[in-house]
Every structure is written in structure tokens, then in C-alpha cells.
UniProtKB/Swiss-Prot annotation:
Pfam families: GalKase_gal_bdg (PF10509), GHMP_kinases_C (PF08544), GHMP_kinases_N (PF00288). Substrate binds at E34, H35, T36, D37, Y220. The record marks R28 as: Transition state stabilizer. ATP binds at S68, G121, A122, G123, L124, S125, S126, S127. Belongs to the GHMP kinase family. GalK subfamily. Mg(2+) binds at S127, E159. This is Galactokinase. Its EC number is 2.7.1.6. InterPro entries: Galactokinase, Galactokinase_bac, Galactokinase_CS, GalKase_N, GHMP_kinase_C_dom, GHMP_kinase_C_sf, GHMP_kinase_N_dom, GHMP_knse_ATP-bd_CS. GO terms for molecular function: ATP binding; galactokinase activity; magnesium ion binding. The keyword ATP-binding applies. Pathway: Carbohydrate metabolism; galactose metabolism.
Length: 391
């Protein structure tokens, strides 16, 4: 957790005045339900206790000034003349401001200072945390009445339409709606959700492989296209389907010969992953961590074999975790081709689990991974810890 008192001091040093508000939006890790969100399916993420913070103060002109404490970079743009920048991180902020204006929300300019302890490039949704935090800062500064789901959709729209990344809704939605000590089962079609408590005896352990995700963007778009192609082919027999969410395992079995590879395997992963996600949420609701862990393991096998988004070194992390004491289940999380694994581990075994996982991975690959032991946190809101009086 970042110290908000330090953020206030940095803001004052940079802008010569205290911020009027500091907000935070968390990163996320998805326990199960991978590559299902853009297929109108089900996901089961938690908001983690690492977040992006925005210290902000309203201006009374059209100017937005942004300083990144982490990158030591700045951006300035006019709120009524928003254009794309050649600096990618600028566009997340500009895109959110534009999305708010297009939706009819009047904005004044602002001074913003951004800092984050969400690891970038690890698949923990640092970009969604940034979008949601900036959107919420604009909301607070301008006294806007925006429901949580609307803020998530606006942030997703900014990433889709302005940044140019065709992400699903999960990352932004959990950044808005996350609940401490709970995972959220989210229906990505109608955005309905229910909170499921996490057993207090179990820890969420994230392991960053530090494998650069150089193929993630192109492969992600390719997988989306393959899923869309599966839907188009299956509409010959099931004209009412809108997405793979509407396809059952029986549908696939009846017409698998009509789906060429790799489209058949992609569809099989999504359809079965939706089932696993629903079963997993039900298992945790009744406190059955063993069943949930087994479903996590099945999910990884499907991501590896059917969706083909894992890598050998990621498989080493997962297989090693499976054999360590206290681990109920482990899998790749995020888009794939690097990034992180997530494991559910008995809390009193976390220290030895982490030590042994890092050792085996380093011996096998030569890489040094990073462990994050996370707690499920609340979604976006004001950050008041150590902030002092907010003016």
C-alpha cells in the first residue's frame, strides 16, 4: 500500500498546492474464468491490495496536467480538444476524459499526480486500475453522479476505442466493484455479480514469472477472432446464439466435426471454462477449497492445451505449485504468454510454498520470479490512509 501522505507531499512539491482528493483503484487477479469475458461468459476475479493512486485537484480552466510519479513523466492536454498521444500511458488518461465527455458528463480541467504499486506488464490489470482511478478522480472533482457499472463501461470504452486494446469488461468491473475478502462471480453479458467470501485460512499467492509478454497482444486478438469464427459456424445449427456463452458442451459434441482446428479447441476451452467458473464459485460458497483447486488445475490444462496461451516456463511454475505442501490449485492468470500464475495456498504454508516455488523455478529456468501474497480488497474509492486533511 502506498503512503498517501507521501503522495500529498509529492503533489504539493510538483504543483505548489495540496490535492483536494486522493483516490485509489485496485489491480486484480482472476481466480478462474480465463478468456471468457469477451465471450459474454463468467469470470471470478478478486481485487488485490495493490492499487493505482491519483492525487487530484480541480482547475477552473480546460487544462489537464498529469504527472506520473513512477515514470517521472508528464502530460498536458486540453479537456475540450483531446487527441491521441504517441506516449501510450498518456492515452489511458486522455481516453477516460474523452469517454466521460462523450457520455455527456461536463468536465473542468485538473491537476493529477499518479502513482501505483500494481506491477506493470504482469497481467494484473495495471491499465484498468489507472483508467478507473482517473475516471473516479474526475467524477469526484466534478461532482458527477456515475454508477459503478457505468464507470467500468466508460473505462473499458476508453481502452477499446482510444487506446486501441480490445479488452473485455472484467478488469474495469472488478476495479470498481471489488469487495474486501471476497471474490466476485461476474456475468460479463449483463454485468450482474455476486460476492463469494474467501476462506480466511487460504491465501491468494501470485507469482510473476518475469517473462516478457511480447506475444500477448497479437495472440489475444487472434483468439478473439477464432472464438467469433466458432460462433459463426455454429449458428448454422443454433441461429440464436450470440457468443460462446450460449454454446453448451452438448452443442460442441454434436457438431465438433464442423469446427476445424484450432477453432474447435478454442471453443472447447471457453465452453468448459464457463462451467468450471460456475462450479468453482459454488464450491467456494460451501467452503470446498479442494474442489475449487481441482478446477483451477483443470483450467490451466485447458489454457495450455486447448487455448494454447501458456509457455513451458509458466507450466513449470504451475506444475511445481501443484506438488508443494498447502497448495490447493494453481494456474496461469491473465491473457497468457508470460505474466503471472495464481495459487490458492493454506495460509500457514505460504512462506515455505513461496520459498520452494522460487527456488525450483530459478533452478529450472534461470529466472528470478516475484511473489505477491495478496488479500482481496475493496474496489475504487477515496484513499484516506495517512492523507491528512484534504482541502
Amino acid at each position: 500500500m502506498l503512503d498517501t501522505g507521501t503522495l500529498r507531499a509529492r503533489f504539493q512539491q510538483h504543483y505548489g498546492i495540496h490535492p483536494s482528493v486522493i483516490v485509489r483503484a485496485p489491480g486484480r487477479v482472476n481466480l478462474i474464468g480465463e478468456h471468457t469475458d469477451y465471450n459474454d461468459g463468467f469470470v471470478f476475479p478478486v481485487a488485490i491490495d495493490r492499487a493505482t493512486y491519483v492525487a487530484a485537484r480541480l482547475r477552473h480552466d480546460q487544462l489537464v496536467r498529469v504527472a506520473s510519479s513512477d515514470l517521472n513523466e508528464e502530460d498536458t492536454f486540453a479537456i475540450d480538444q483531446i487527441e491521441r498521444s504517441n506516449r501510450p500511458w498518456h492515452n489511458y488518461i486522455r481516453g477516460v476524459a474523452l469517454a466521460l465527455r462523450v457520455a455527456g458528463h461536463p468536465l473542468l480541467g485538473a491537476d493529477l499526480l499518479i502513482a501505483s504499486d500494481v506491477p506493470r506488464g504482469a497481467g494484473l490489470s495495471s491499465s484498468a486500475a489507472l483508467e478507473v482511478a482517473v475516471g473516479y478522480a474526475f467524477q469526484v472533482l466534478n461532482n458527477l453522479n456515475i454508477l459503478g457499472e457505468e464507470l467500468a463501461l466508460l473505462a473499458q470504452g476508453a481502452e477499446n476505442n482510444f487506446v486501441g486494446v480490445q479488452c473485455g469488461i472484467m478488469d474495469q468491473l472488478i476495479a470498481v466493484l471489488g469487495r474486501a475478502d471476497h471474490a466476485l462471480l461476474i456475468d460479463c453479458r449483463d454485468l450482474s455479480y455476486r460476492a463469494v467470501p474467501l476462506p480466511p485460512s487460504v491465501a491468494v499467492v501470485i507469482c510473476d514469472s518475469h517473462i516478457p509478454r511480447t506475444l500477448a497482444a497479437s495472440a489475444y486478438n487472434q483468439r478473439r477472432q477464432e472464438c467469433d469464427m466458432a460462433v459463426q459456424l455454429l449458428r448454422r445449427w443454433y441461429p440464436g446464439i450470440r457468443a460462446l456463452r450460449d454454446v453448451s458442451e452438448d452443442h460442441l459434441a454434436a457438431h465438433s466435426d464442423a469446427l476445424p482446428e484450432p477453432i474447435r479447441s478454442r471453443a472447447r476451452h471457453v465452453v468448459r471454462e464457463n462451467r468450471r467458473t460456475l462450479q468453482g464459485a459454488e464450491a467456494l460458497e460451501r467452503g470446498d477449497v479442494v474442489t475449487f483447486g481441482r478446477l483451477m488445475n483443470e483450467s490451466h490444462a485447458s489454457l495450455r492445451d486447448d487455448y494454447q496461451v501458456s509457455l513451458p516456463d509458466i507450466d513449470i511454475l504451475v506444475e511445481t505449485a501443484h506438488h508443494l505442501a498447502g497448495c490447493y490449485g494453481s494456474r496461469l492468470t491473465g491473457a497468457g504468454f508470460g505474466g503471472c500464475t495464481v495459487s490458492l495456498v493454506e495460509r500457514n504454508e505460504v512462506e515455505s510454498f513461496s520459498r520452494d516455488l522460487l527456488r525450483v523455478y530459478h533452478n529450472a529456468t534461470g529466472r528470478t520470479a516475484t511473489i505477491y501474497v495478496c488479500r482481496a480488497s475493496d474496489g475504487v474509492g477515496r484513499a484516506t490512509d495517512n492523507a491528512g486533511p484534504q482541502e
